[in-house]
Amino acid sequence: WSGSYTYLVGNKPAIRAGFGILYQGSRYTGNTTNTTDKIQTHYFAPQFSLHWLKQQFDWYFTTGTGYQLYKDDSMVYDKPRKVSMNKWAANFGIGGEYHLFTHWGISARISYILAYSGEYSVRYHHKEWMVQPHYPMNGSDDISQLSFSAGINYHF
């Protein structure tokens, strides 16, 4: 799920800058033989965007940096495990919108949130550890997200 608000500067058609805020959240549940994962992420970030407006079309690029909250409540060999990785992250996105009416439009967007775990906390079997990857930024500590969304927009 996601939500965003953008304020466009100026009133000329063509290319316009925008400022706003982005929220994006996700939930994943998975099971294997001895493990059950319940992962939730929440991302909040101020945004800067460039919009190319042409008649009823709006093509845009967005970027921002914010904070990603990551929580994993799992069961491993019938014992609870909690992982917390709350980190700074950055996002990039491209999208487009077709304006059906004055206040309504349909849109699609591809977004990427770039985040690495770095050091994080694991609580398992009544003990807590701080974990630090041996090889940072080689992919094993990647908690990034790629998403595609489509929807109906209302313009105030």
Regions found by a protein language model. Give the residues of each.
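Conserved alpha-helical elements of sugar-nucleotide-dependent glycosyltransferases
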Residues: W1
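Gram-negative (and chloroplast) outer-membrane scaffold detector with strong preference
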Residues: S4-A90, Y98-W104, I143-F156
